[in-house]
Amino acid sequence: MGNAAEKITPAIAPARILIEAEAGHFQPSRLEIIDQPKFSSGKGIALKSGQLVDIYKPSAVADIAYEFNIPAAGRFDLFSWAATDDAAYCYIWIAVDGETPRQKVVVSPWKDLSICKELLQKADLTAGRHHIKIWLPEKVTLDRLELLPVRIHGIPDSAAKYNPSIVPPATRPRLMVTQQTLESVRKNLTVGENKEIWESLKKEASNPYVLKTDTPPPPKSKVKSKKPSPQIIGVFEDEKALDIAVKKAFVCLMENDKAKGREAVKLIADYISKAEFGNQLDVCRKIGFLIYSSALVYDWCYELASLDQKRIIRANMMRLAEDMEIGWPPFKQQVINGHGNEAQLSRDLLSMSIAIYSEDPQPYKLCSYRILEELVPGHNKDNRSGRHNQGGSYGPYRFGWDVYAAWIFYRMSGKKIFSADLKKVPYFWIYMRIPDGEMLRDGDIFTSGKYWSYAFNAFLDYTYSNDPLLKGEFIRQDGMNWAKKNAVLFLLLNDSSLKAESSLDRLPLTRYFSDPLGSMICRTGWSFDRNSSDAVIEMKGAGTYFGNHQHLDAGAFQIYYRGMLAADLGLYCFYGTPYDINFNKRSIAHNLMLVFDPAEKFSEGRGNDGGQQVLSAYSPNGKILARDFGPDLQKPLFSYLKVDLAAAYSNKLSSYTRSFCFLNLGLNNSPGVLITFDRLATVKPEFKKYWQINSYQKPEITTDGFVITSIQPENPGKLIVSSLLPKPSNREITTSGGNDANTVFGRKFQAPAALPEAAGWRTVIYPKVASREDLFLTVMQIADGKAPPLQTEQLNSQVNIVVAVADRIVSFSRNTATIKSAMELKVPSSRQQYHVLLCDLETGKWSIKEKSGKGLFNAVVKPDAGTLFAILQSGEYIVSPGNNPALPEQ
């Protein structure tokens, strides 16, 4: 056996203590030393082939035993480095100084599996000799252990000197309810939908509850550590106890039932003093829920707790606060985005700080500084858009914690900390909802189900905004079932007098989202049924790239009609895997322009997908140049967006603009048309330009484009794609997919799930002849499976590029500049009249006359639109800048 005592040199200072894996006592019959070039010593230790984890026998002997010296007492972080071939959670078991073995994550599936670093636990160690025992799992090679003194993050001077403008009241309760609001909450308990939930809560709170202090006996069979055991050894969690304790405290508060209040205090004091958590990702969410629940009981039952119980609860809340990802003091993470913008600060630590404010005001000062001086100003800027930068799953989740913080402050002080724009943001997810109950994809998506639900967030949204439409959305998400499981929060905030409005028909069919996330979502209706005839189209612009779960997809589009037609192909499982950073989050998984420079390098080992550059967070990725919809703002005939996207790409592009125009045709079998017009110039003509669209099924190539059919088995939708530019003589169309769907210019990445996206198809249009500048004009007709193609033609002039489809005409500037001079417009004779949209016009007054000289009317082109809409008979016209006093105003 190896001898740890002989091989480890005692540290002369507690700054860093390194323990090589192969330097301990181990059983040669079970373990072997393996060469690993990436490891610190070039070697590691692993179980021999055929050996299984055997910890569950009482007489089990550790696989490896280490002995080491600590020259000075301190609190240490204990880290491990390990490797595996399996992209799954891998667990070791560890015991420090004879304590009960604890199961800890040693490899996380999204990290570098060849050398994965994990924080196993914290350890308070005295000066002198210490021991660590390790039980290894299969297929894991241990590199080393390392002890580092726990780093306490400093408090910025501005936070240390901060005097909050809003402080908790001296009276109790003060958390989620105050003396001023207590009576209204009590009166609302037996009104409307609250009554049943209140009666059920009281019944549950009346039952005694025994804390589960013992770990259940482990199964007798051998268990592979790749999957966690039913109860992780050495980890004590009992979330049911928290639920019961808070319900007892709530009944105490509502009915002055002191007996239940004392029961709640005892449950929390007993639990929090024993609670211990593992090291798996996001464990801070469980820790935080314990802190929050403890804070509620501490505040609501304050007069019923003994001095010793108060001390225990306060001390352990502060102990657990150190294990939060954001740390304590809470400055380890930024709060505008990421895990720092979740419950840990906005609910958990904030609630703790309010509950203990009378005894210690420092925690509240630090939490309120980060929220009121950092999070609120930053998100007030973001909320102007009405869109959330973290997309369809993480967006509502993180936004919900903003609203939670807003509720906590409002209930405590009567003051609203966010601007009124906060109330706009929930409508982003309403507009993203597609008829089958899912949503258009945006960012990393983990939501599933027939009707994607985020009822917790929808509840906070409608209660804070007092909005009947948002309450209707909560009901659609099976919200009342959620309410039964979250009875205390529901009864605290739900106003039974607010009646849910189920229909969304009074909402405009197009919604524009402004800077910093400029974009537009267009709908043809508000029905939610898989066989609905409603289409949903997203035209994504640009503004700011925030990073994290946001994708590199500025300028992308999506189309839904009886199934996804223009789809995102990325799937999200784990953050930062090779597939995630090379395909899922990258431009190639989206419907946008790719420009391939074979010499382009992307950061952090990412491959070249020809797409947008990996920007640092909060960088500009383009800007909206023009936008408009109308003429009826409720049911617009056209929706137009123009965006400058050059900033989203590297310097391989010298300029790039994309114009979108969605035409709502109002036809049963052809609800609409999406037109994209791209003008881009590269610094070198040989850089290949690709107009890309993704689909779940293989497209059928046609003479002028291709047809995509949705995978919906009954009444599928189809997308008839016509490429008008490049011209046919200079145009190639290719498609690839199935097993090659996730291949990025020769490099294949394995998708994490067997969903339609994993075997989708990527179709590209590109010019045959290399040129510095190219134009792409593409018309996409949305239709049911039996509808014939609509007639499409070009009617170009020297000034503009014109598309006619069905009874619509859309004109774009032929040049990069806006149109400032008179131009001719030919309206074909195939129909009696057309709805005409002229884009890219100079701001100001314009007039339209027949070519024969008869004047028709004047119109004003708005500076943020650059458009002129008119209904014209077939014929020839002249559109001129300037006002003709003899003509009527449009």
Segment roles from a protein language model:
Residues 480-712, 770-785:
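Catalytic and substrate-binding regions of extracellular carbohydrate-active enzymes
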Residues 49-52, 62-66, 116-120, 627-628, ...:
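Short structured motifs
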Residues 507, 511-515, 526-532, 634-889:
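Beta-rich accessory regions
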Residues 356-359, 397-565, 759, 764-775, ...:
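Carbohydrate-active enzyme catalytic cores, enriched for enzymes
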Residues 62, 88-90, 119, 128, ...:
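Residues that flank catalytic or metal-binding motifs in active/ligand-binding sites
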Residues 174, 179, 189, 194-198, ...:
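Aromatic-lined, polymer-binding surfaces characteristic
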Residues 5-166, 176-178, 845, 849-871, ...:
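Extracytoplasmic
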